[in-house]
């Protein structure tokens, strides 16, 4: 029998695998630069294409999850994701990467949050923030461990063999997790009517609050996608070895564990609005330091601070959406928010790569991200307080 704690474990494995592998791609930048002579604009464009594809497919994935359940959606997406990463070993032209990231990687990314976190919201009507945080700790462990594993494989084999090993391993892990992530039986749902209540998609998607949540995601998400994509290669630019630079990604993952659990523990009490603002402060401090320092120790310290908030923000969004609109069409609404975020997330890494290619520095990129997070904070301040959720006031 599938228990809700097995669902949590399976969802965590999905997070560990998908996001950990995505983070590890940054470790391959130098190898691909040396092998093919491609610019960082090209290499970062791949992740940008994946994010955009993720957003488009997330809308579809949300609808399919609400209709058919998460298992089949996660299973198909997981196989495509793993095979896609393995296919990187066969590339010889930039368009090969674009196709792989646009289809295989993008489809895999589109389901890892929408299908898992919406399912968790149904299983845990109480303590939703903390359980979401526990699931997202899987992401943190992936961010922490898989870049180091990728660096180890590159050093002991080569980059192409590393992609094959990682990709095939991903297929098995994601198929396992797909078998465990299932919705509660109807009997379980009937015991808690909250799981059956909430705004319909057609109503919620037209509200001002929902549009603000989409805008907030669009404005802050470029930072969450750009820093993991470029921070390792930024470290090598500052004189770090490849292994030391890979530890920057692992540092984000390790710190994000603390961030996810800390915010998850208090999210249900603070509410989404305060939680957003709590997360934006350390991100702004970190971006400010990245603009001005070349000191390795300072980089590591503020990468850790950034990682705390990076992890926490991924915990904030799904429960906040449920706070305002309930669970009736949670996956479908979440898919729209993910889409809005990935539009910004797709733009961020490309512009950062272009800025580096033109200026030889990431300072302009860090400054732009800083401004976007400030704007996102302003929009958060206009959100209604938590007592204006759909359970207290229709038409949020």
Protein language model features and the residues they cover:
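Extracytoplasmic gate region of multi-pass secondary transporters
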Residues: 25-29, 208-261
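Intracellular juxtamembrane helix-capping segments at the cytosolic ends
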Residues: 32, 111-124, 312-325
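Symmetry-related core transmembrane helices of the 12-TM Major Facilitator Superfamily/SLC fold
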Residues: 163-179, 364-381
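Flexible cytoplasmic inter-helical loops of multi-pass small-molecule transporters
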Residues: 182-199, 390-394
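C-terminal transmembrane helical hairpin of 12-TM major facilitator-type secondary transporters
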Residues: 252-256, 262, 267-320
């Amino acid at each position: 029998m599938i228990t809700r704690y097995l669902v949590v474990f399976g969802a965590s494995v999905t997070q560990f695998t998908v996001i950990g592998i995505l983070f590890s791609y940054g470790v391959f930048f130098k190898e691909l630069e040396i092998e093919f002579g491609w610019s960082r604009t090209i290499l970062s464009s791949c992740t940008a294409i994946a994010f955009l594809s993720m957003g488009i497919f997330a809308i579809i994935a949300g609808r399919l999850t609400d209709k058919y359940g998460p298992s089949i959606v996660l299973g198909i997406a997981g196989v495509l994701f793993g095979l896609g990463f393995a296919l990187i070993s066969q590339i010889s032209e930039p368009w090969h990467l674009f196709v792989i990231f646009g289809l295989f990687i993008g489809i895999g990314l589109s389901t890892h949050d929408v299908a898992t976190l919406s399912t968790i919201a149904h299983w845990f009507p109480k303590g939703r923030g903390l359980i979401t945080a526990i699931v997202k700790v899987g992401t943190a462990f992936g961010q922490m461990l898989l870049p180091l594993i990728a660096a180890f494989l590159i050093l002991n084999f080569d980059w192409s063999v590393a992609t094959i090993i990682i990709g095939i391993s991903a297929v098995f892990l994601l198929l396992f997790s797909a078998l465990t992530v299932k919705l509660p039986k109807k009997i379980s749902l009937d015991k808690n009517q909250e799981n059956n209540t909430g705004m319909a998609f057609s109503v919620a998607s037209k509200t001002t609050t929902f549009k603000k949540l989409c805008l907030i995601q669009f404005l802050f998400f470029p930072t969450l996608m750009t820093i993991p994509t470029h921070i390792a290669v930024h470290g090598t630019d500052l004189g770090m070895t490849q292994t030391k630079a890979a530890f920057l990604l692992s540092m984000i993952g390790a710190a994000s564990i603390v961030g996810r659990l800390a915010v998850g523990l208090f999210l249900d009490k603070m509410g989404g609005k305060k939680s957003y603002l709590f997360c934006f402060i350390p991100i702004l401090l970190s971006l400010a330091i990245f603009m001005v320092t070349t000191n390795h120790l300072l980089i590591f310290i503020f990468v850790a601070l950034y990682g705390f908030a990076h992890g926490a923000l991924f915990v904030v969004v799904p429960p906040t959406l449920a706070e305002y609109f309930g669970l009736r069409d949670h996956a479908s609404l979440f898919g729209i928010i993910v889409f809005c975020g990935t539009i910004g997330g797709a733009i961020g890494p490309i512009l950062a790569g272009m800025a580096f290619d033109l200026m030889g520095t990431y300072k302009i990129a860090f400054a732009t991200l800083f401004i976007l997070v400030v704007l996102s904070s302003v929009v958060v301040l206009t959100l209604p307080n938590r007592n204006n959720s759909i359970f207290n006031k229709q038409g949020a």
